[in-house]
Regions:
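N-terminal Rossmann NAD(P)H-binding glycine-rich loop of SDR-like oxidoreductase domains
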Residues: 3-23
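NAD(P)H-binding glycine-rich loop region in Rossmannoid oxidoreductase-like domains
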Residues: 35, 39-88
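Conserved Rossmann-fold NAD(P)-dependent oxidoreductase catalytic core, especially the SDR/UDP-sugar
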Residues: 90-132
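Conserved beta-loop-beta element that borders a ligand/cofactor-binding pocket
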Residues: 110, 143-166
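Glycine/proline-rich active-site loop of Rossmann-fold NAD(P)-dependent oxidoreductases
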Residues: 138-139, 151-153, 164-173, 207-217
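Alpha-helical substrate-binding/gating segment
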Residues: 175-183, 191-224
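C-terminal amphipathic/interface module of NAD(P)-dependent oxidoreductases
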Residues: 260-296
Length: 296
């Protein structure tokens, strides 16, 4: 199958593309510069331009691009986080909807922040959505896919947890202090951190492309943990104690609103739809997932 991928140079995209190619798929990457090969197509979401002709014959698309949430949220940064997702998603969805024939599937990235802070509540794809900036972003992001679904394209809205990889993301940022023996819980440590191994993210995206799941899909391990449990497991994985907690007041002073929504609160999410569809998580346990991530 011909598969179009945005964000192919990012953490997930860089891991996904070789797997799709090894499975025999033809992958075309959407890039925001002049294409360097026949396997690249140029697009500029802010300008509203995309190489629609190059997408002809695509069987599916995976949309992974979007500004990182892992920095302090200024007003300008929040606008960039929202617009980078919504504008690009709408352009891609409208373009795919106008193709003849149309692709069969659009798999779009997203996050479990869409549920907001829910304490100990167990969250599945049937749970109500929450409130807050990340929830608002998630709603708008998923809504931007509507042109594709209205055209009959099967849309999969991934709601991913913390992706475990040493190359980038939350785990990469935690590694240095933890290796120095300076790691510990964040705030109370009682907040839930739903996580997922990078290998399982890649496998789940391929599963979504080739299968028949549709709508919101929680992309998280079946075994969420609290922040205190996560930090203890990470300390064990790197062979260091975890006796230096990061107080909530310090997190708020350093990261502002981002700390409130992304560090000090969390979601206890379960991958109900993936499990019901028969997806098998290779790294369902945190210790095994951390061992795999740190061995790469």
């Amino acid at each position: 199958m011909k598969i179009a991928v945005t964000g192919a140079s990012g953490l997930v995209g860089a891991a996904l593309v070789p797997v799709l190619e090894a499975a025999g798929h033809e992958v075309v990457r959407l890039v925001r510069r002049r294409p360097a090969s026949t396997h690249e197509l140029e697009w500029d979401p802010q300008a509203g331009t995309i190489d629609a002709a190059g997408l002809a014959g695509a069987h599916g698309a995976v949309h992974l691009s979007g500004a990182t949430i892992g920095r302090r949220w200024t007003a300008a940064r929040k606008a960039e986080i929202l617009e980078s997702r919504v504008v690009s998603t709408r352009l891609l969805a409208e373009t795919l909807a106008a193709l003849d024939p149309r692709p069969s599937a659009l798999v779009c990235a997203g996050g479990i922040g869409i549920y907001g802070d829910r304490g100990d509540e167990i969250l599945t794809e049937e749970s109500e959505l929450g409130t807050g900036f990340l929830s608002d972003v998630g709603r708008a992001w998923e809504s931007a896919c509507e042109p594709a679904s209205a055209a009959g394209i099967r849309v999969v809205n991934l709601r991913a947890g913390i992706v475990l990889a040493r190359e980038d993301g939350a785990l990469a940022r935690l590694l240095t202090p933890f290796k120095l023996g300076l790691g510990g819980r964040v705030g109370s440590g009682k907040q839930w951190w739903s996580w997922v191994a990078l290998d399982d993210v890649v496998a789940a995206i391929r599963f979504a492309l080739e299968g028949d799941v549709a709508g919101p899909v929680n992309l998280v391990s079946p075994n969420p943990v609290t922040n205190a449990q996560f930090t203890k497991a990470l300390g064990k994985a790197v062979g260091r104690p975890t006796v230096f907690p990061f107080p909530a007041v310090a997190a708020k002073a350093m990261f502002g609103e981002m700390a409130e929504e992304a560090l000090l609160t969390g979601q206890r999410a379960l991958p109900a739809k993936l499990l019901a569809a028969g997806f098998d998580f290779e790294y369902a346990e945190l210790d095994l997932a951390l061992e795999r991530a740190l061995a790469k």
